[in-house]
Amino acid sequence: DIPHKWSWVRLGELFQHNTGKALNSSNTSGTKMQYITTSNMYWDRFELTHLKEMVFTDSEVVKCTVKKGDLLVCEGGDIGRSAIWCFDYPMRIQNHIHRLRPYTTISVKFYYYIFFLYKQTGLIGGKGIGIQGLSSNALHKLLFPLPPLSEQYRIVEAIETVFAQLDSILTSVS
């Protein structure tokens, strides 16, 4: 159950969704550009020291480019692993990454934490109980809570306060 001021919504009501480009050695038209794969993505961060390159046409650049504030979600591997693109420059993505771009003002960080919750509870990527892969169709079937915007921000602040306290405790004992 959720509070009465909240509602349940499907992903497509909150985010415009695309996946990246599949690597195809026969595709040689376009411009060679760097892109990220699931191996560059970790929970809440990116490792960008070893980027791959492939050729992108102009239309693929539009479809496969992420910009600051986009929520990226892994389709396979560590299914549901998510991070928010926080850089001031665009980047392309390969096909095993979902790009979620909000239609309107929402706390993208709140939905990052929802993906973290869904992963930790086995709703996605679980052992036989949740969604095993995160295809576009599977992603679109997921329900997400939609609290008022002020509550989204308050919840994120509370989560980050607790995580900061945990980090402080871990630092003091190590």
Feature-to-residue mapping (PLM):
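A short beta-sheet element
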Residues: 37-38, 54-119, 125-128, 133-135, ...
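Flexible loop/turn segments at secondary-structure boundaries
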Residues: 8, 43-45, 80-82, 164
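Non-catalytic DNA-recognition/assembly elements of restriction-modification systems
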Residues: 1-21, 149-157, 161-174
